[in-house]
Each structure stands twice: as C-alpha cells, then as structure tokens.
C-alpha cells in the first residue's frame, strides 16, 4: 500500500505510550494529540508547492518562499477537533471544512449527518484529520464526499490505524496519502482498534 505512511520517530513512540495509558488525564491527552498531530502534518506537507516572493529584512531586500497552495482542514466530528489546533498553529491561513459522522453501534458503520465546506473547496488541498482510522468506512465516505465536491488533492492524517481499515481504504482511494503514527494489531468485535487508546472523542472531551 504505497499510499500509506507510518511515521516512525522516537518522540512519537514515547508520546503514544503516554497517550494510550488509561491513567492519562484529559488535559494531557489533548496535549499529546496536539503534539503528535504536528509531527504527522509536518510529514504530510512535505510536497506542498511553494512560490518565491520578495520581502525586505531589516537589512536588505531578499527573496523568500511561501506556500503556494490553498489548504482546507477537514476535521471529522467530533474527535478530530482535538487535532485541529495543531494544524492551525502550523498553517494559520487554512480554511476549515467540517465533516460530521456518527458511529452506528449496531452496524459499526458511520452515518454522515453534517458538512460545511468553504465555497472554494474544490480549489483547495484537503487535509482530513481523524485520530482513529479503524474500519476505514468513515475515511472512505469522507473522501467520496470531498471528491464529489470537486476536491482534487486529499491527504488523511490519523494517530492510530487498523490494518484492515487501511487495506480497505487503499482499494477505494489509492490516490489519497494516509499518514499515521502507528498501525495497531487490528479490530475487536466492536470495531475498536486494539490495543488502541479507547474512545478518542470521549478522552479528548472528558465524557467517559
């Protein structure tokens, strides 16, 4: 699966270990999500195009580079809201396109209930963020929707992923690069990633 990138780094592994622990407090959990998301965004943005502009330093004029792509961050509600701030810190001029999915506990599928994209969404590079990439169903539906709206370039960032979900996603969207911090063992009978870290949304918002 050439479109799947698992980012290996000692600091990511260290932070993941704390993130997984059930004793980790909500404020720590949010901080770790933010930090790991920054690592992943750094990798996902390596091929962003640049343009040269002229500026004046306090000493003289010079040519510098700046992003030449319009970026749209697409958090999948609600857990991905914990990742949003880290992306904003690195790309403050990005627009946000919200995608709302709710998990059906009986079918283990996600129902699409809300979307709000920028008017110029099809002109932007979409960075979809969701901390957990489990069955792949939500990711597939999110990318299906974005493509239906004319979005040409999509990247996906997740903290943890299950191999089953990644394989299923790659069969449907091999043109979408996925960046994850860790690929776990798999899924349990309820469709949760194992060993995982529990329900990311509940841990971010302290609603356990």
From Swiss-Prot:
Keywords, in A-Z order: Allosteric enzyme, Glycosyltransferase, GTP-binding, Magnesium, Nucleotide-binding, Transferase
The biological processes this protein is annotated with in GO are: UMP salvage; uracil salvage
Task: Kindly provide the name given to this protein in its UniProt entry.
Answer: Uracil phosphoribosyltransferase
Lineage in the entry? Bacteria, Pseudomonadati, Campylobacterota, Epsilonproteobacteria, Campylobacterales
**What is reported on the regulation of this protein's activity?**
Allosterically activated by GTP.
Give cofactor(s), names only: Mg(2+)
* Residues forming coiled coils: none
- EC number assigned by the record: 2.4.2.9
Catalysed reaction, written as an equation: UMP + diphosphate = 5-phospho-alpha-D-ribose 1-diphosphate + uracil
Task: State the superkingdom.
Answer: Bacteria
From the UniProt record, which GO molecular function terms apply? GTP binding; magnesium ion binding; uracil phosphoribosyltransferase activity
Query: Record keywords: Glycosyltransferase included?
Result: yes
């Amino acid at each position: 699966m050439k479109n799947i990138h698992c980012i290996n780094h000692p600091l990511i592994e260290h932070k993941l270990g704390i993130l997984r622990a059930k004793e980790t407090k909500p404020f720590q959990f949010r901080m770790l999500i933010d930090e790991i998301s920054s690592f992943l965004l750094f990798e996902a943005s390596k091929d962003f195009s640049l343009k040269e502009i002229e500026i004046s330093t306090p000493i003289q004029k010079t040519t510098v580079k700046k992003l030449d792509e319009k970026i749209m961050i697409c958090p999948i509600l609600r857990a991905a809201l914990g990742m949003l701030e880290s992306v904003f810190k690195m790309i403050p001029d990005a627009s946000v396109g919200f995608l709302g999915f709710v998990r059906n506990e009986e079918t283990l599928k996600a129902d699409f209930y809300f979307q709000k994209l920028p008017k110029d969404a099809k002109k932007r590079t979409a960075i979809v963020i969701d901390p957990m990439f489990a069955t792949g169903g939500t990711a597939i539906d999110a990318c299906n929707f974005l493509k239906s709206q004319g979005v040409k370039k999509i990247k996906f960032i997740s903290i943890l992923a299950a191999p089953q979900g990644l394989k299923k996603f790659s069969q449907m969207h091999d043109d979408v690069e996925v960046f994850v911090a860790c690929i776990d063992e798999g899924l349990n009978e309820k469709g949760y990633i194992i060993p995982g870290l529990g329900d990311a949304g509940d841990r971010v918002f302290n609603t356990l």
